């Protein structure tokens, strides 16, 4: 499953200028932080809810399932005939079941009479039902029959309804599914655990003018005997698979199709009249399937793959085997009206979901503890795939900004969790669909791939997929296969990364010894609140690469740091050469250099001799060290000014994100405008070089960079940018000159931030007129930029209106919270005032966690952590408990950062104003 893109986390941190701060200072800061955490009850997660997995005495062999959805009254009828194996004599069968009413149930042992169930005991809290029988079911096989009814809900989970508008303007509904993690039980009674696999024979009774899809190809379509307006559609039997991967869709769709070079039928289903918008995803999918087949050396196991755009969809996409569901914005590309970033996103999401067809579907995690095996791996290999299809995207540099740093932000918190985390109750499972399972998982796999090399990695992946195909596996099984392929101690190394939370800070200092360079390395757990405080500091086995200015793109030495401290000698390094750790920013750690080593690296930023991904990593480490209180934020601002010649989009993107975090922090002060002046000074030179219009020879990354820079300058109030944005917006609205898709977001943001009620009304009109969901989302994401209190309230009210799809409400409210200090307060009040409606809308899924995170994490006053905690104590959100803890911790970290550095930042900005620096 691909989670929809979140706004950048407000939690960045790390590196070092000058000698380390006195340990006592760090200790005092850390202890005071942790005292505040403990006083608020935020230092540890609450006790886990009681949970038991299903008993093993009865298990399915095959589900024969027929569903008849009613698209007018939003109900469905179901008939299940499950071939089952009774492994231990029993008089009851326990299954998962939620929001379903069972009408009748019976069990017929093979060759014997049917036994009717005499009772259905629903355990609603545990989402289970116990079927009781009057006599003992003996060991052996038999058939379990259940007739049931359910509701096509509007919660975007289970078997639910999705609203769409026909080309003629009529509102209609499709019936669609979203079962991961634990919602197949809302469509039919089942053994809803990933390790309880079976085959499926699915039939759908649907209106004859509707499209019906499921995991497999259609094998029969015939009139339904009881109603001439209905047809019964039967699908081929699936391979052995987990319940969470079952899917069905009933609605009105067009499609485009092709065949991959391996002969697999590939279709992209789109809303009626928009088949053209499916062609880009179709092209990507047709390239991706053979790429994965060759990489894994395992063929795609189904005869077809459908990719379909769903109007109301909570996640970004879902990898159902053979029928992958997507948000419209994650699948559809309009050749004229889609921006470059949307094309890239579609390519990544398609690559992610198709990777799951092997890694997750063919071989499935044994339990949700190993979710990261699915999501971490897919989140890594999607980049490998896109790099293969679109090498011009420089996608691996973007990985560092999008995934690697995002994971480190979260994993530095006291309220993080290990990659492998014990989960039980469904509410706990929802919680781990986060940046640890996805982005940290992807980052440590990237590190592992680099450590053992591509050849042995591919060999190990083939061994793993071949051995466990159509079965389940745990993390240890993957390590064993990779260890056998590479001969390296994979389990010993990787257990330090997956079984304990956090990551190390590597401190390094250097000494020239004749013609060699002696490096002294030490590792300690990096903490967002400063130094680690505890009896036994965790240790990692860290693959470390070291490069020098002699050849910045090649590792001079690779080592495995398997102890707290070690010395390394680099042969033949001249005194004037710099030395850098973590070539390519591949190792999942932060680096803190001695002042002399760091000073030697800074010219490499100015003259671009450091590779882009290393410039990015160096800056990001510094910023994170400042957030943690290890260095002064002023030192980071000085380094940021060295990026005046920077040409790389992703480096600018990371700089922009960090300056955005700092701007949010300083919005709590009375010198917010001074940091905006700094932003304008840093971004003006690159803005002038780029201009507003594409130049001959420019490509994908230039388009991304132009939009980023103009948006940053416009938001900061850069006069020339603001004037040009207003001119182009006026021409766009009047139809004189339509804005290119790549310029719309920065222009919309700029005119709204510095506009009035008329500007907002025009934006809302553009939203209403937009035929394309990408354009609607583009507008929704910038509405929060408006500054006037009455307009902020208007945007918040709009967020819950019928004009905004349920899954997009979160980004509108989050945009308000991130737009200004007043917006943050207004958004928090709005959430509290409308909590019942919002919580019911998302039913405790991951969108509620996203909403909470985006809305409160930008606060920087200690008392707000207490207020947030108190609100959720009286308004429980079980699936967001960890997110709430993390948000409160971040609020305290922001407050500490502000108290510590605000005055020095202010003085530095005033000093710059008095005598602008020359760079």
Curated annotation (Swiss-Prot):
Pfam families tied to this protein: ERAP1_C (PF11838), Peptidase_M1 (PF01433), Peptidase_M1_N (PF17900)
The keyword Transmembrane appears for this protein: no
GO terms of biological process kind: cellular response to hypoxia; peptide catabolic process; positive regulation of protein targeting to mitochondrion; protein polyubiquitination; proteolysis
Tissue expression pattern: Detected in liver, epithelium of renal tubules, epithelium of small and large intestine, gastric epithelial cells, and alveoli of the lung (at protein level).
Chief localization: cytoplasm
Listed GO MF terms: alanyl aminopeptidase activity; aminopeptidase activity; metalloaminopeptidase activity; peptide binding; zinc ion binding
Site features described as Transition state stabilizer, chain residue numbers: 438
Subcellular location as annotated: Cytoplasm, Cytosol; Nucleus
Regulation of its function: Strongly inhibited by bestatin, leuhistin, actinonin, amastatin, 1,10-phenanthroline, DFP, PCMBS, Zn(2+), Cd(2+), Co(2+), Cu(2+), Hg(2+), EDTA and puromycin. Not inhibited by PMSF, and only slightly inhibited by leupeptin and aprotinin. Activity is increased by Mg(2+) and Ca(2+).
Catalytic residues as annotated in Swiss-Prot or TrEMBL: 353 (proton acceptor)
Modified residues (3'-nitrotyrosine): 464
SUPFAM superfamilies assigned to the protein according to its UniProt record, in alphabetical order: Leukotriene A4 hydrolase N-terminal domain, Metalloproteases ('zincins'), catalytic domain
Cofactor: record remark: Binds 1 zinc ion per subunit.
Domain of life: Eukaryota
Thermal properties of activity per the entry: Stable up to 40 degrees Celsius.
pH-related activity note: Optimum pH is 7.5. Stable from pH 5.0 to 8.0.
Enzyme class: hydrolase
Binding site for substrate: 180, 316-320
Quaternary structure, from the entry: Monomer.
Family: Belongs to the peptidase M1 family.
Physiological role: Aminopeptidase with broad substrate specificity for several peptides. Involved in proteolytic events essential for cell growth and viability. May act as regulator of neuropeptide activity. Plays a role in the antigen-processing pathway for MHC class I molecules. Involved in the N-terminal trimming of cytotoxic T-cell epitope precursors. Digests the poly-Q peptides found in many cellular proteins. Digests tau from normal brain more efficiently than tau from Alzheimer disease brain.
Listed name of the protein: Puromycin-sensitive aminopeptidase
């Amino acid at each position: 499953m691909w989670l929809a893109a979140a706004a950048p986390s407000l939690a960045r941190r790390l590196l070092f200028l000058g000698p380390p701060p006195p340990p006592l200072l760090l200790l005092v800061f850390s202890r005071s932080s942790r005292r505040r955490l403990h006083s608020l009850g935020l230092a540890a997660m609450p006790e886990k809810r009681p949970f038991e997995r299903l008993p093993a005495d009865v298990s399915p062999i095959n589900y024969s399932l027929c569903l008849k959805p009613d698209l007018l009254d939003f109900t469905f009828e179901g008939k299940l005939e499950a071939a089952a194996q009774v492994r231990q004599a029993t008089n009851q069968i326990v299954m998962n079941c939620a929001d379903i009413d069972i009408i009748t149930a019976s069990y017929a042992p093979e060759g014997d009479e049917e036994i009717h169930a005499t009772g259905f005991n629903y355990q609603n809290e545990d989402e289970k039902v116990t079927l009781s029988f009057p006599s003992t079911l003996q060991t052996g096989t038999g058939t379990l029959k259940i007739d049931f009814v359910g509701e096509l809900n509007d919660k975007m989970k289970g078997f639910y309804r999705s609203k769409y508008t026909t080309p003629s303007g009529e509102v209609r509904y499709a019936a669609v599914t979203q079962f991961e993690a634990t919602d197949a039980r809302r469509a039919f009674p089942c053994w809803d655990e990933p390790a309880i696999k079976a085959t499926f024979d699915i039939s759908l009774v649907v209106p004859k003018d509707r499209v019906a899809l499921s995991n497999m190809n259609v094998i029969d379509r015939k009139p339904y005997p009881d109603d001439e307006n209905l047809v019964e559609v039967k699908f081929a039997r699936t391979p052995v698979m987990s319940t969470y991967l079952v899917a069905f869709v009933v609605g009105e769709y067009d499609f485009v199709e092709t065949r991959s070079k391996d002969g697999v039928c590939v279709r992209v289903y789109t809303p009626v009249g928009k088949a053209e918008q499916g062609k880009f995803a179709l092209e990507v999918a047709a390239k991706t399937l053979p790429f994965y087949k060759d990489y894994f050396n395992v063929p795609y196991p189904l005869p077809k793959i459908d990719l379909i755009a769903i109007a109301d969809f909570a996640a970004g996409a879902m990898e159902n085997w053979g029928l992958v569901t997507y948000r419209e914005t994650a699948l559809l590309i309009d050749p004229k009206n889609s921006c470059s970033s949307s094309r890239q996103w579609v390519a990544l999401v398609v690559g992610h979901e198709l990777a799951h067809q092997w890694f997750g579907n063919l071989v499935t995690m044994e339990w949700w503890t190993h979710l990261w095996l699915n999501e971490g791996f897919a989140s890594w290999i999607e980049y490998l795939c896109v790099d293969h299809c679109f090498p011009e995207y420089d996608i691996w540099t973007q990985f560092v900004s999008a995934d690697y740093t995002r994971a480190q932000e979260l994993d530095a918190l006291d309220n993080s969790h290990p990659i492998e985390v014990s989960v039980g109750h469904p509410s706990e499972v929802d919680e781990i669909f986060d940046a640890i399972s996805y982005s940290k998982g992807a980052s440590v796999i990237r590190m592992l791939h680099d450590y053992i090399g591509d050849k042995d990695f591919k060999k190990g992946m083939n061994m793993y997929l071949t051995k466990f195909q159509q079965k389940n596996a745990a993390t240890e099984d993957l390590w064993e296969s990779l260890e056998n392929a590479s001969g390296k101690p994979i389990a010993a190394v990787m257990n330090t990364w997956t079984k304990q939370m956090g990551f190390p800070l590597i401190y390094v200092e250097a000494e020239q010894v004749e013609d060699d360079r002696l490096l002294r390395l030490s590792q300690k757990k990096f903490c967002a609140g400063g130094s680690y405080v505890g009896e036994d500091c965790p240790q990692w086995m860290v693959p470390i690469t070291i490069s020098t200015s002699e050849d910045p793109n090649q590792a001079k030495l690779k080592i495995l740091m398997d102890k707290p401290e070690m010395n390394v000698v680099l042969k033949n390094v001249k005194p004037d050469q710099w030395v850098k750790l973590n070539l390519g920013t591949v190792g999942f750690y932060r680096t803190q250099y001695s002042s002399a080593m760091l000073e030697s690296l800074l010219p490499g930023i100015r003259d671009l001799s450091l590779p882009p991904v290393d410039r990015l990593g160096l800056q990001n480490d510094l910023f994170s060290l400042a957030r943690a209180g290890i260095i002064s934020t002023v030192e980071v601002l000085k380094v940021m000014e060295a990026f005046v010649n920077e040409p790389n989009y992703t480096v600018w993107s990371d700089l922009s994100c960090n300056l955005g975090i700092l701007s949010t922090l300083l919005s709590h002060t009375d010198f917010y405008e001074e940091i905006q002046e700094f932003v304008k000074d840093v971004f003006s030179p690159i803005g002038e070089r780029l201009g507003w219009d594409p130049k001959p020879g420019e490509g994908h990354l230039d388009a991304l960079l132009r939009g980023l820079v103009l948006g940053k300058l416009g938001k900061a109030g850069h006069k020339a940018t603001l004037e040009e944005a207003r001119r182009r917006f006026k021409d766009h609205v009047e139809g004189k000159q339509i804005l290119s898709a790549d310029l719309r977001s920065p222009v919309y943001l700029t005119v709204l931030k510095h506009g009035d009620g008329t500007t907002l009304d025009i934006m809302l009109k553009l939203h209403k007129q937009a035929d394309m969901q990408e354009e609607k989302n583009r507008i929704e994401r910038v509405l929060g930029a408006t500054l006037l209190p009455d307009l902020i309230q208007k945007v918040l009210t709009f967020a819950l209106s019928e004009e905004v799809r349920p899954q997009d409400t979160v980004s509108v409210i989050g945009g308000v919270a991130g737009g200004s200090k007043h917006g943050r307060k207004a958004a928090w009040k709005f959430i509290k005032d409308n909590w019942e409606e919002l919580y019911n809308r998302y039913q405790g899924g991951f969108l509620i966690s996203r909403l909470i995170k985006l809305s409160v994490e930008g606060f920087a006053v200690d008392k707000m952590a207490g207020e947030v905690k108190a609100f959720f104590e009286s308004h429980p959100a079980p699936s967001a408990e960890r997110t709430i803890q993390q948000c409160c911790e971040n609020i305290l970290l922001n407050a500490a950062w502000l108290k510590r550095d605000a005055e020095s930042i202010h003085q530095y900005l005033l000093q710059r104003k008095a005598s602008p620096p020359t760079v």
